[in-house]
Amino acid sequence: MSRIAFAAMTAVAAGVAFAFLLLPLVAIFLRVPLGDLLDQFGNQVFRDALVVSLKTSLIAHVAVLLFGTPTAYLIARKRFFGRGALITLIELPLVLPPAVAGIALLAAFGRLGLLGDELDALGISIGFTQTAVILAVAFVESPFYVRGAIASFESVDPDLIAAARTLGAGPWRVFGRVALPLAAGGLGAASALALARGLGEFGATIIFAGSLQGVTQTLPLAIYAQLEQDFDVALAISALFVLVGAAILVSLKVFAWARHGSISPFRFAASTSR
């Protein structure tokens, strides 16, 4: 194949791929006048869903960071029997359909679930509450963060860890003053990607928490609900969600460029595993 033919073929393939990815997003904004977009800030459905999304996503994300960071550090620093199986288990939610995740959460924490009687005895009801939303979001986003955090901690030079221990630093000091700062770039990228995934969660949430406005209805659920009632409102909320996602991605790119001179957060996150 000649060089010109190859260049033409790759250009056509790239053009088709780019058009396929861009066209649906452009179509949303072509259907939504700016006035309708701004009007959504006065829409009670949108405001309630935004509050629920931000509240539950932030709580879930903080929990993922608090529990996921030490877990990732342990897995990255230690070599033990079953380590590979444990990592595979952590990654398993990545390949599960969201509906399966929701049913699994119901089977574990629902009223008739594995822990249902114990929770009921304590007067705790999780299913179809904001707590259920938080658990659903944490379940689907945690593999994104933990897997990226493991790679980030693995990228830290073991000699620096050993040197800190030789100088008398205890495990807490080594973790907080050496490992965390050196892995901060990758941890930040993994955190942002996990947060974005959590904000977009739909399937597990609607099955485990339902879609009650002002209580468990997040932005993705509000879009789905409005789709059956007012397509224009669903389009406007979708456009706002695209803008939120774009803002997160741009922030990632700026952060990655500032830290590593790369505009790709995915390349940046991958570089931490080397």
Regions found by a protein language model. Give the residues of each.
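Periplasmic/extracellular loop-to-transmembrane helix junction in inner-membrane transport proteins
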Residues: S2-A8, V26-V62, L74-K78, A225-F231
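Interhelical loop and adjacent transmembrane-helix boundary motif
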Residues: S2-F6, L37, Q44, T205-S251, ...
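C-terminal transmembrane helix and the adjacent membrane-cytosol boundary/short C-terminal tail
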Residues: R3-A11, V16, P24-A27, I150-R165, ...
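Cytoplasmic-entry segments and transmembrane alpha-helices of multi-pass inner-membrane transporters
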Residues: A7, A11, L74-L105, I161, ...
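Transmembrane alpha-helices
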Residues: A11-F18, L92, F139-E141, Y145-D157, ...
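Membrane-interfacial helix termini and adjacent extracytoplasmic/periplasmic loops
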Residues: G35-L38, R47, G102-A138, A209-S211
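Transmembrane-helix boundary motif in ABC transporter permease subunits
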Residues: L38-Q40, I59-I90, I103, A107, ...
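Hydrophobic alpha-helical transmembrane segments of multipass integral membrane proteins
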Residues: V51, K55-F67, T71, P97, ...
